[in-house]
Amino acid sequence: MSKIFVNPSAIRAGLADLEMAEETIDLINRTIEDNQAHLQGVPIEVEALPEDMKKLQISDHQQGQPSGGATGQDGSEEEDFYMTESENPYIPFQSYLDAVGIQLVRKMKTGEGFLKIWSQAAEEIVSYVAINFPLPADKESAEKSTQTVGEPLKSNSASNTPNKRSKPSTSTDLKAQEASGPHGIDWAASNDEDDASVEAEIAHQIAESFSKKYKFPSRSSGIFLWNFEQLKMNLDDIVGGAKEIPGVIRMAKEGNKLPLRCILGGVALTHSKRFQVLVNSEKLGRIMQEDLNKYLAN
């Protein structure tokens, strides 16, 4: 009967590698926990956003009437931002690390080299963290960026004036709305009156891509993925928010393909506080404008 001799130095080296792997995973956990501290602490109150959809309207009113989107979301805006257990990204990441550890042990039992196994696992962990946990630039920029301050909307006094004064005020209204919109956005398309067929077309295109994830710029230099399911809204409410984006009704009435990423970004920016915390508003404004220009040109 043959005997298999194991070199004690090889066992010590393997144990040292395992300890190094455990320390690396613990370091990643602590880093992510520190970076997510601003999501677990005091709730963030967003008083006013320059990207609010009320400011993206086009002054195409003949009677200077304010848009209907300017009413009634104070109750939902005042809700405190607390992450539930299902929304906490740290919990699925912990499960992911546990699964990676199990895979490491199984591969090592088959006789594969630890360095090769760990290099592959490290690449997977780094890619997972880069996608799901974009790092903030620093604490100061994070604190300043989470509290966005927008210019207050000027009240439209022309709605209470006679019709004779409504025509001269249209040019000033256009300038005020252009100044209050997001950086780099110049809305050139207006929404026409819609009907049931338009709503059906918008709902159909959104439903087809309801679970598709789109890339959005984060407050750090990275990106994050978002889809319509994460809005946790009814399809009718999403369609209502999409109709407030200039040009969407016109494209739907003509049967053209809709800029779904632009629609998702606009609706999420208004209704999702978590999206507001993660997204880079300036870059999002440029992306939404580029998508609108691209789809309107077709």
From Swiss-Prot:
Bias (Polar residues): 144-174
Motif Nuclear localization signal in this chain: 212-215
Transmembrane parts of this sequence: none
GO process annotations (BP): symbiont-mediated suppression of host innate immune response; symbiont-mediated suppression of host JAK-STAT cascade via inhibition of STAT1 activity; symbiont-mediated suppression of host JAK-STAT cascade via inhibition of STAT2 activity; symbiont-mediated suppression of host type I interferon-mediated signaling pathway; viral transcription
Keywords assigned: Chaperone, Host cytoplasm, Host nucleus, Host-virus interaction, Inhibition of host innate immune response by virus, Inhibition of host interferon signaling pathway by virus, Inhibition of host STAT1 by virus, Inhibition of host STAT2 by virus, Interferon antiviral system evasion, Phosphoprotein, Viral immunoevasion, Viral RNA replication, Virion
Motif Nuclear export signal positions after renumbering to this chain: 49-58
CDD domains: RABV_P-protein-C_like (cd21032)
Gene Ontology cellular component list: host cell cytoplasm; host cell nucleus; virion component
SUPFAM superfamilies found in the cross-reference section: Phosphoprotein M1, C-terminal domain
In-chain residues carrying the UniProt-annotated modification Phosphoserine: 211, 272
Region (Disordered): 57-79, 141-190
Post-translational modification: Phosphorylated by host PKC and by an unknown kinase.
UniProt KW Chaperone keyword: yes
InterPro entries given in the database record: PP_M1-like (IPR004259), PP_M1_C (IPR037199), RABV_P-like_C (IPR049506)
GO MF, one example: RNA-directed RNA polymerase activity
Summary of subunit composition and partner proteins: Homotrimer when phosphorylated. This trimer is stabilized by binding to the L protein. Binds soluble protein N, and ribonucleocapsid. Interacts with host STAT1, STAT2 and PML.
Function in brief: Non catalytic polymerase cofactor and regulatory protein that plays a role in viral transcription and replication. Stabilizes the RNA polymerase L to the N-RNA template and binds the soluble protein N, preventing it from encapsidating non-genomic RNA. Also inhibits host IFN-alpha and IFN-beta signaling by binding and retaining phosphorylated STAT1 in the cytoplasm or by inhibiting the DNA binding of STAT1 in the nucleus.
Family: Belongs to the lyssavirus protein P family.
Name of the protein in its database record: Phosphoprotein
Native source species: Irkut virus (IRKV)
Gene: P
